Regions:
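C-terminal transmembrane bundle of multi-pass solute transporters/carriers
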Residues: 1-167
């Protein structure tokens, strides 16, 4: 799964801006972030490795689109005098959040433990790591939806029609 997320990330960074070149960057950032969150939720619920690899590649692609779009918007919005400091601050903040997540996520996973759910004749077992990923996916999807709504620069145009026109 580690290799597939980075394969998807590279594909999203390389091809996302080309595929969605006519799409609004502001809308693309929020939408891609929300879709990444939804695929992270799906990944947390899937126990089949082949399907998980496919979902992970798609997750990585939308994460790459979010990453490159976010950094592009940041570079366009920030003035030249403070751009270097702004990017340094963002990179430092990313590292701090990464260390915090690496410290806190195992604690959450251990606290949640393992749960078994029974549906009719089948049984599904989820461990704390899967539920922690599920929580992270829900948070990412909610943050993506909120950012999409806040940065919506064309309120009269629906997301679906904007995607269709961007892909033509």
């Amino acid at each position: 799964l580690f290799g597939s997320v980075f394969t998807g990330l590279a594909a999203g960074i390389a091809f996302g801006p080309r595929v969605f070149s006519q799409f609004s960057r502001r809308r693309l950032f929020g939408a891609a972030l929300a879709v990444s969150g939804f695929f992270l939720v799906a990944l947390a619920l899937i126990s089949n490795l082949v399907i998980a690899v496919i979902v992970t590649i798609i997750l990585g692609a939308f994460s790459g689109i979010s990453w490159v779009t976010g950094f592009t918007m940041l570079g366009m919005e920030v003035e030249n005098e403070v751009r270097g400091r702004t990017f340094a601050f963002v990179q430092s903040l990313i590292r701090i959040v990464l260390v915090a997540v690496l410290a806190i996520a195992p604690l959450i996973a251990a606290a949640v433990g393992e749960h078994t759910y029974k549906f009719y004749n089948s049984e599904v077992t989820y461990n704390g790591a899967a539920i922690t990923i599920l929580i992270a996916g829900i948070l990412a999807a909610l943050i993506g939806i909120v950012s999409y709504r806040q940065m919506r620069d064309r309120p009269g145009i629906s997301l679906v029609s904007d995607i269709v026109s961007a892909l033509r």
